Design a protein with these regions (language model features):
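Flexible active-site lid/hinge loop adjacent to a nucleotide/diphosphate
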Residues: 511-629, 664-668, 733, 737
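ATP-dependent carboxylate-amine ligase
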Residues: 3, 11-58, 473, 486, ...
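Conserved N-proximal alpha/beta basic substrate-recognition cap immediately N-terminal to
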Residues: 96-237, 250
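Walker A (P-loop) phosphate-binding motif
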Residues: 464-506
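Active-site nucleotide/adenylate-binding loops and adjacent lid/helix of ATP-dependent enzymes
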Residues: 67, 160, 184-344, 392
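Adenine nucleotide phosphate-binding catalytic loops in nucleotide-utilizing enzymes
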Residues: 575-582, 586, 596, 615-737
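ATP-dependent carboxylate activation and anion-phosphoryl transfer catalytic cores
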Residues: 1-161, 298-320, 347, 351-354, ...
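Residue-level signal for inorganic ion chemistry
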Residues: 159, 413, 502, 540, ...
Length: 856
């Protein structure tokens, strides 16, 4: 076996809507069926006893080593606790090549699972040992390390259930919800609306206490000190049991409670100063420790927190009892698990010492030993849900505390005897207000039921029916994508949207280019959706990006397929046929939202077949108003667009909805340029699907300018000494045919064409381009461009020349090296009333050159 390529498919893709690892594997002839591999399966199942082959692989005859890798990768992740179920192996047309696709929940885990699966299968093949438990432990640890923690994870899960898109921005807990101008962000239990001032107030415990006291909320009395002598002095003034804690602390770090003696005060002060210079000394409030979670202006959850403790068995030391408790799989070292491991640290030792105990002491049977007096989960405490027991007045105190500090999500710590009574009746009070509160105790309490805190946070950020989505239009096809994308974006701008757009010539935000080059892939789409000044997005969605990484979004409102025709880029990335190419481009149709539309070319059979995969509605378009697909769709009472004489017609069933004169659409040159009429139909379909007002659609079509600046390489017209020059990036047979048809609408004495060929296309596709041109042009200039894309020197020119053999119209054939030299040669030979079609390769450079050298 040979692992030839590994890719992470980070969005909906050719295989599924799941994120997945795609591996291209070459199998030797004897590896294409494990039936002939003696004892291989026995050894494989010895190393991996729970391996399961899916029903799709019915017998050993069909199980290749690539299939084995597939199922081992999936099985390892599943046994490590990852929520994965999808996998698939497809035999490519190349001999011995298989494409293996396996779902992952975390990319790093999926990649590691592939590495471990390769090692396991190799060990089985070579009759060697493999430590399965070590591999599963490694996968499980990595998954725990990289996946979202329980607090952030609960919020993300709630967003998924509400169909709110999300994107993880870092390896940590920073997550974006929504797209463009509707985006919001969280980091754990902080939101993009959480006030920095409020967080600073919450961090200053003395200031917080003053604000709450002013609002009539009960708080413990106390003072701030910066040395141990003053701490003891304040303790004496308070005249009771006290609490010592850092003024700017968090998560219960450095907190000591129930302090009485001078020695205890000084020890606690020293520990607290590890976490802050200023220390609070305040009156100790007897009672139980409760955490109330306030989201917005509502109390969402409440939990009683109990300090970390062990129960003696009469034979184990306290250290041993702690070690036994820490074996609980619910306890971990950080915040990824519901509970945190108990630590024997200085505070724990001091707490034991007050009871006359040490870490090596052996408690008697049934003796409860508390290891610290604060009950934070982050220091090993446990929680019991008491949400339904909270008295309305006590809830009101917690909400007032949150509002006084100014936090949108707030953890209010209250000490009192019971939550079913108001604070005033029991002498309790608010001891702390926390920004970014942990949610674990409410999601997975040790006792009681889980509370839907993630739902509450998402509902605060996006009240129903908001979902954080902006209109998203995805455009794919063989030809016409870029022009269609630009026209749709222009119409949306006419509607008042701030539009983000991606295409093969850049990324545009509000009509300003922010990135250059081919930006028709998922990375550019994600960048647009992350931009806060985008109200609507239009994406050119090319074959390469879909194959390389999948889509840059989970769903689109409109999916437009301009055409498939004879295809392009065939023979690349294991896509050999037009049918396979249609499967790739149809990914956007399969991922149209159920409430959305697919806008499909009714005249292209490959495009029409995509309709059955769409979850939304279909709008068909065609130049021919009587096309059978158009007629059938109309008969079913559905939406269609077509050309009728000199108008574009929008109809639902037999009812005409709107008419647009082609004379009012400059892009089509009064309807003379057929492929631009098709591009316009597709664009109007997208705008119609988004419920844009027809007057605004007409305004957008009338004001759209297609020139070398606004649509570079898309039928750009120049004048040179009385001749017409057309520059276009057409580079496949269908595009050439459309260009020939459009050029024929321009009267000319002589017709000239300048062409090169893309070396990464099939031989027959390169030949066919000049075969088509040879029927329509008097003279042809063949040029070799800078990049041959893997071809030998002169090889592309030879193929282009072969296509002109027997040409009916072409009489003059010239060859030259260099695109600009070819342009110069063509312009020199032009006479007034001639026409020259220049098929450019370096779009921006060639257009700039033409603007300089053409002389109207």
């Amino acid at each position: 076996m040979d692992l030839q390529r590994v890719r992470a498919l980070r969005g909906p893709n050719l295989w599924s809507r799941h994120t997945a690892i795609e591996a291209v594997i070459y199998c030797e002839e004897d590896e294409r069926s494990i039936k002939g591999l003696v004892d291989f399966e026995i050894q494989l199942r010895t190393l991996f006893p729970k391996l399961h082959f899916s029903n799709a692989v019915s017998s050993h005859e069909h199980i290749s080593m690539a299939h084995v890798i597939e199922h081992v990768v999936l099985g390892l992740q599943a046994q490590a606790g990852c929520p994965v179920t999808f996998s698939r192996t497809v035999k490519a047309s190349h001999e011995g090549i298989y494409q293996v696709v396996v779902e992952y929940s975390e990319e790093a885990v999926g990649r590691l699972a592939l590495d471990l699966a390769w090692s396991l299968v190799s060990a089985a093949r070579e009759n060697k040992k493999f430590d399965l438990q070590k591999a599963l432990h490694e996968l499980s640890n990595l998954d725990e390390d990289v996946r979202l923690g329980p607090s952030t994870g609960s919020i993300v899960q709630s967003s998924v259930e509400r169909n709110i898109p999300y994107r993880r921005l870092t390896d940590g807990s920073l997550v974006q919800f929504g797209w463009g101008s509707k985006q919001k962000r969280i980091q754990a239990a902080e939101t993009s609306d959480t006030s920095a001032i409020a967080e600073a107030i919450a961090q200053d415990k003395e200031l917080t206490k003053d604000l709450l006291h002013a609002a009539g909320v009960a708080v413990p009395m106390g003072k701030v000190v910066d040395n141990a002598d003053d701490a003891w002095k304040v303790a004496q003034e308070l005249g009771s049991t006290i609490v010592i804690k850092p003024r700017d602390g968090n998560q219960g770090k450095g907190v000591a409670v129930n302090i009485k003696s001078e020695e205890q005060v000084r020890t606690a002060f020293e520990v607290a100063q590890h976490y802050g210079r200023k220390i609070i000394v305040e009156r100790y409030m007897p009672g139980q420790d409760f955490r109330l979670l306030v989201v917005g202006d509502r109390l969402i959850a409440a939990a009683r927190r109990d300090p970390p403790q062990v129960i003696g068995d009469g034979k184990s030391t306290i250290v041993q009892l702690v070690e036994e408790i820490n074996k609980d799989p619910l306890r971990g070292d950080g915040h990824a698990t519901p509970l945190t491991k108990i630590r024997i640290d200085d505070i724990a030792l001091a707490t034991l010492s007050k009871k006359g105990l040490q870490a090596e002491s052996i408690p008697i049977m049934g003796q409860k030993v508390v290891l610290r007096n604060n009950a934070n989960l982050s220091t090993g405490g446990s929680a019991t849900d008491v949400t339904e027991d909270v008295h309305p007045d006590l809830a009101a105190s917690a909400i007032t505390a949150a509002k006084m500090v100014g936090l949108d999500i707030c953890g209010v710590d209250i000490v009192c005897e019971a939550v079913y009574k108001p604070l005033e009746e029991q002498g309790g009070g608010v001891v702390e207000v926390n920004a970014a509160p942990g949610l674990r105790m409410h999601l997975n309490p040790s006792y009681g039921k889980s509370q839907p805190v993630g739902d509450a946070i998402i509902s605060m950020m996006y009240p129903t029916p908001e979902n954080g989505r902006i209109p998203v239009v995805a455009v794919s096809g063989t030809n016409g994508k870029t022009t269609t994308v630009r026209l749709i974006a222009h119409v949306l701008r006419t509607h008042g949207h701030r539009v983000g757009m991606t295409s093969t010539d850049g990324v545009y935000i509000e009509n300003e280019r922010i990135d250059t080059g081919d930006c028709s892939g998922p990375k550019s789409a994600r960048n647009v959706l992350m931009h806060p000044q985008v109200d609507a997005a239009v994406f050119e969605t090319a074959r390469g990006g879909i194959l390389r990484e999948g889509l840059g979004f989970d769903a689109c409102d409109v999916g437009v397929i301009t055409n498939i025709g004879e295809g392009d880029h065939l023979g690349m990335s294991y896509i050999e046929t037009v049918e396979e190419l249609a499967e790739v481009k149809g990914v956007i149709v399969r991922n149209v939202a159920p409430s959305g539309h697919a806008v499909l070319n009714a005249a292209d059979p490959m495009v029409v077949k995509m309709a059955k995969t769409c979850r939304g509605q279909i709008i068909y378009f065609a130049l021919n108003s009587h096309h059978p697909v158009i007629s059938t769709h109309r008969a079913q009472g559905k939406k269609v667009l077509f050309r009728e004489k000199d108008e574009i017609i929008a109809a639902i069933g037999s009812k005409i909805i709107h008419r647009i004169p082609l004379a009012n659409i400059p892009l089509t040159d009064h309807g003379q340029i057929g492929f631009q009429v098709e591009n316009t139909l597709a664009s109007v379909g997208a705008a119609w699907a988004l419920n844009i007002d027809w007057k605004l659609i007409e305004q957008g079509l009338a004001s759209f300018v297609s020139d070398a600046k606004t649509a570079p390489g898309r039928f750009n017209l120049f004048k040179h000494k009385g001749a017409t020059v057309i520059a276009d990036y057409g580079h496949n047979p269908d595009a050439i045919r459309a260009l020939v048809q459009a050029a024929n609408a321009f009267p000319a004495n002589n017709r000239h064409v300048v062409i090169s060929g893309a070396g990464d296309r099939r031989d027959e596709d390169i030949r066919l381009q000049t075969q088509i041109l040879g029927e329509a042009f008097d003279s042809v200039i063949l040029y070799q461009d800078q990049c041959q894309r893997g071809r030998e020197d002169g090889e592309v020119l030879a193929l282009l020349r072969e296509g002109l053999v027997g040409a009916k119209k072409t009489k003059d054939i010239q060859e030259i090296r260099g695109e600009f030299l070819a342009i110069d040669l063509a312009l020199e030979q032009l006479n007034p009333n001639d026409l020259c079609l220049i098929l450019i390769d370096q779009v921006e450079e060639s257009l700039n050159y033409l603007q300089k050298v053409t002389k109207p």
